[in-house]
Amino acid sequence: MSGSDKTYQLDETTLYSVLNLKYGATEVQIRKAYMKLARELHPDKSKSEEAGELFKKVAHAHFILTDKKEKMKYDSKLLAKGLYDYSPRIPNDKSRQNGMFKDTAKNSKTFTNNNNKDDASADTSKSKPRKSRPYEEQPYGFGVDTGRGSGKNIPLFKTFNAKSYQNSKKSVTPPRPKQPSEKNKRATSFSNENRNSSSVPLAKNQAKKTANSGSAVGSESRISSSGSESSSNVNSATGSSEEPDVHTQHKMARKDSYLSGFQSKARSPESPFQDPAQRHFVRTKYVSSRYDKRSLSPVKTTPNSSTETLNNVKNIFNSMSDRLRHTLFGNSNGDAEDEDQHNTQHDTERLFKRAKLPGRKILTDEEIDEIVKQQNEAESNDPDRQDYGNSFNLNVDNLSVNTQDFNHISEPSPEKEETKANKAPFLEEVYEIKSDNEHLEEKAAVSPDDGIDTLGLNELGETLPNNKEPFDMRNVGDSLDNYQVKRMKVSPKPRSVPSKTTPGSSHAEENLQEPVNIPLPRIYKLDPIPIEKFNVDLSISNIKLPEMPNLLCNVLDKAQVLECQQKTAEFTKQTNETKRKLLHILSQRCSADEELHDKLYRVENVNRMVEAKLYDLELMTKLSELLNRQRMVAENYAIMINTMYASGLLEKN
């Protein structure tokens, strides 16, 4: 069948459907689907131009779905469009016979001879799975596909042969076990091809093989071969389906020599594994899975109580003290027993204090040489260094090592003394190891004001919290004042429908914690204005207006006229001073109103504003009265002067 006879189909709705997959397929599934389509649509495999264009779409879909960023973008688009649950419309492998294409030429071909019929039966037997049913369930009648290969092409006029039908069903039965003479034989593709190409039946070839091996008698083999020939001829004449089964045999997988060696051995009846290879695989898989889960911490198991935690802490400190002792004094092979006894005696409790040293000083080479000479002289002068109960001090500027409770250690070897003499210890942090008795004595002697914080293991056990006691979370919120917590925007309580109120009604009955559809009342803040800022001078009541002078006089008397003139001048002077004072107070009031314009009309300042306006009115009343008096005095004086002018007395004077 050529490439032009194939019609390819792809569901291009989504990139997943192009690869015949659903949304959410894994990378392995995408890779397998791409490789499967590439074998059919690649230009090197197919000569059709349509296949080349479809392969570009398949490659593009594979590129997008294998890139993590592009796949995330594409998946978000599918979720937005609602195509995440779309399934491809191309039929699956069970319903299609020829992959991604349809055989369009098979329906148009007609078979005229027996060879063409055999070829067509071979194609259908390859494409459709064989149906194996028991004898009682086999259907009979016209137009029924029994799935027996070439048997369905039997002419209608041919009679049914029960023996040939039974021989055709032999392929369904399990194969017979191999004979001892056939164990070393291997079925290869070459042997299968020879059996397929040769016209000799299968039973005849089997008889030849047994004759060559020499494992059977010649006469018996001839009898068996003749019998098999007759049976095979009957099968070929009746059109049995055994010969097509021989043609459809595939190449057998090569057996591994390593596994075959294990399989040859007898399996123990008590073993749950089929062979040693399976047991080896399971054990290797279990070990490799457990290898990455190993704990690297000194405490291998999680402690179940505070006592186990204390014991683990003790063991860690004891191992650190042993390492420190070994670095300072060494350890001989003969002291192993004493060291074990010491560990058992002092594993119960120990006190460890970290001595803080002053700032480290960098020593020169000359100072280091002097230190080494002093150490050598001290060791040469005191060869018997057995008592370690006192202390071991290296007094070098900023270095001090204090160790006690080492009476159990014997004298070190002279070789180790020489090696220690050549070393200048530079220790930045030193742990002091105390025994139980010394710890009690020092605890009684040291006062709490010494500034040294020591904590025994017993006290540590009392201070540590018990694992059985639950943690109290009630006071945790006190330390989270500045932490921003997202609160619910809507109260979980059911909403109450607010009643419709008029704009003038009060909102005192409304609950401010529940959302309402009416404007909430404002929280009003009072801002009163003191009376002093209004520039109201209460001393205005004490201001007295000048009295009007009496201008009644004898016009003919010159002295009386002059006296009236002086009284008028004094009155005018007094009224002008009072008027100037009243106008000054009024101007201050005007400026105060301008400054307090924003706050003047608030509720708490309205009454004060009324008082200020009354004050202004009082000022204006006094001012108007003063002006009225000035008018009246001026009119009287003008009448007097005009009378004198009319009489002619003014010209004479």
UniProtKB/Swiss-Prot annotation:
GO terms for cellular component: cytoplasm; nucleus. Residues 85-308, 490-512 are annotated as: Disordered. Residues 213-241 have a biased composition (Low complexity). Its main location: cytoplasm. It is found in: Cytoplasm; Nucleus. It holds the Pfam family DnaJ. Gene3D superfamilies: DnaJ domain. This is J protein JJJ2. It comes from Kluyveromyces lactis (strain ATCC 8585 / CBS 2359 / DSM 70799 / NBRC 1267 / NRRL Y-1140 / WM37) (Yeast).
